[in-house]
Amino acid sequence: MNQMNQINKTNQTNKTNQMNQTNQTRILWIGGIAVMVVAALLFAGVAQASVNLPLQHWAYSAIERLTALGIIDDAMVVTKPYSRKEAAKYVAQAIERVRADQISIDGREAIAEPLLARLMVEFRPELIMQGVIEGSGKERTGSLRYGARVQSEVDAFFVGEGQTVRFRENRGGEYYANGVQNQTDVRGWLEVGDWASVVVQPKFISNRNALSEGPTIGPLTSLNDQYAYMRELSLKLSFRNVALEVGRGTQWWGPGYHGSLLLTNHAFPLDMIKLGSDKAFYLPWVFRDLGKWKINSFLAQLEDERDYSHAKIFGLRVNYLPASWLEIGLTRLTQFGGQGRGQSFPRTVVDCYKNPPNQTASQDCNEQSMIDFRARIPRTPYLIPFPAGMQIYGELGSEDKWSQIPIPSRAAFLAGIYIPQLFKGDTQDLRIEYADTDYTRRKTGFTGVWYNNGQFTSGMRQNGFPLGHAMGTDAIDIYIRSTRYLTDNLQLAHSFNHQERARGLPVHEKKFETSVDLTYWVSARMQVSLGYTYQRLKNPGQISDLTPYTEQFASGVTATNQLFWTSVAMEF
C-alpha cells in the first residue's frame, strides 16, 4: 500500500514538473515572440495618426472588390475598422500599378475605373500627403485636418402579427420598429499633426423603440428610452507604429460579410481601450521574409444591466499576410470580471490563457477563439471560369478553449465565396455565404453552447445582442447578394437570406428574407440610397430577459414584415 502511495506521489510530481516545464516553455516562446513584435512595431517606421473609417462606409466594399479583382495586390482588409490613411495607401497601390502598366486591359476596368476614380476623390488629401497625386494648395493637408459626414435616414417599417420590433442585423443594437421614423447622425473628425485624432458621432432616433438597451417584451422594456445617444466618441494617439485609442466604437474581426463569429457591429458599440499596430509591419532580421503582420487588441466594458455589472472583454487579434493572395487571422476573446467577481486585468487574462478550461473562483472566465482566412484564386480554364477569378474565405471558431485539433469540440464555422466580376467587361458580382453555430448541437447534443456561459449567464452579449454573428446560438444562416452598376454612379443590389435561430429548442424561428436596394452617387461626396426588405418569420422571437439571457418564440405565429428605408449621406 505504501509502495502504491509512493508511486502515485511520484507520478503526480512528474506530471506537475511536466506542466511546469510546459508553462515555462510557453512563457519563453511568448516572451521571444513579444520581443520581436515590440521591436518590429518600434522600428517599422512612423505611422501618421489618422481617424478610422466608420464600418458602414462604402470605401470598405470598394477596396475589397479591387483587392478581389487583383487591382490592389498587397492589402490587409479583413480586420476593420482601419484608418483613412491606411485606406489611401491601398488606393495608392492601385494607382501606382496602373501607372506602371501592371494592370492588363482585360475587362476588369469596367468596374475598376469608376471605383478607383471615386476612391481618389474620397481620399484625395491623404493621397496628396503620401505624394501619390499633386495638390492645388487648397486641400486640408496641414497639421490640422478635419472633416464631417452627415447621414439622415427615413424609415417606414410594418412589423406584423403584433411583433412591434424586429432586431436589425449589424446596426449597432438597433431594431426595426413599427411606424415612420427618422435617424440622423453627424460624424465629425479632427487630426492633429501626426500623433492625435478625434472622432465624435452623436445620433438621433425619433422612435425610442428603435434602439434597445434591454428586453423587447416584459417589464424591463422600460430600459428602451433613448432618443439621442453618442454612437462613437474616441481619441487616438500614435507613436511610431503603435496606436492607443480610448472611447466608444465598433469593430469587425473576420472575413464574413453578413456576419462574423466573434466580433461584429451587431451589438451596441463598446466602451473600450484599444492598442495595436497602426499599419502592417515586417518582423526584424531573418523573419522579414515571412510576410506582413498586424496586431489589434482591446479591453472593453459591457453594460450595467447584466449578470455581473460592467463585465470586461479582452480581445486579441493577429493578422498575417504571407502572400499577396492570402490573409490569415487568429482571434481570441476573454470575458471576465464585473461587480463582485474580484478579478483584475491583466492577471486574470494571463491566467485564462495559460490554465486549462473550466477553472473556478477567481480564475474562471468565458472564452472564444477563431482562425480565419481570405484567399484570392485566379481564373483557371474549366475550373474557375470567372474573368477575375474569385475569392474564398472562412472562419472556424471555438466556444471555450480549442481543446482538440483540427476541429474543436465546441465548433462553429462560416464559409463564403465572392466573385468580383461574373462576366467579362460587366459590373455584376456575386457573394454566397453560409454560417453555422448549430454544428456542436448536431454533433454532441448539447444546446445553447455558442454565446452562452454557465457563469456569465448574460453571455457574450451587449444588451442581449451577440458580439458576434446576429443569428446567435444553435443557428444557421444562408446569405446571397449580387450587385450591378447600371451606370458608373448607380448601383442596384439584391440579396436573399434564410436563417434558423435557436434550433435546439422545441420551437425555433425560421426567417425567409429578400431585399433590394439602389444607391446613387450624386457626387463623390454625396450619395442617396433607398431599399425595401420583405421578411417572413415563423415563430418569431423576442428577448424577454438578460439575466439569464432568455428569448421567447411565438409558437405557431407567422409574421410578415415590410421594411422601407431611404437615406442621404454627405461628406464635407
What residue spans do the PLM features occupy?
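Asparagine/serine/threonine-enriched low-complexity, disordered tracts
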Residues: 2-23
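Bacterial N-terminal signal peptides
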Residues: 32-42
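N-terminal periplasmic/intermembrane-space "pro-region" immediately following the signal or transit peptide
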Residues: 47-176
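Short loop/turn motifs that connect adjacent beta-strands in outer-membrane beta-barrel proteins
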Residues: 76-78, 100-114, 129, 133-146, ...
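Extracellular loop and loop/strand-boundary signature of outer-membrane beta-barrel proteins
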Residues: 170-174, 216-221, 258-263, 302-304, ...
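Surface-exposed loop and membrane-interface regions of Gram-negative outer-membrane beta-barrel proteins
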Residues: 178-180, 198-237, 254-259, 263-264, ...
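Signature for the C-terminal beta-barrel architecture of outer-membrane proteins
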Residues: 252, 272-457, 473-480, 485, ...
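Outer-membrane beta-barrel "beta-signal"
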Residues: 318, 371, 520, 558-572
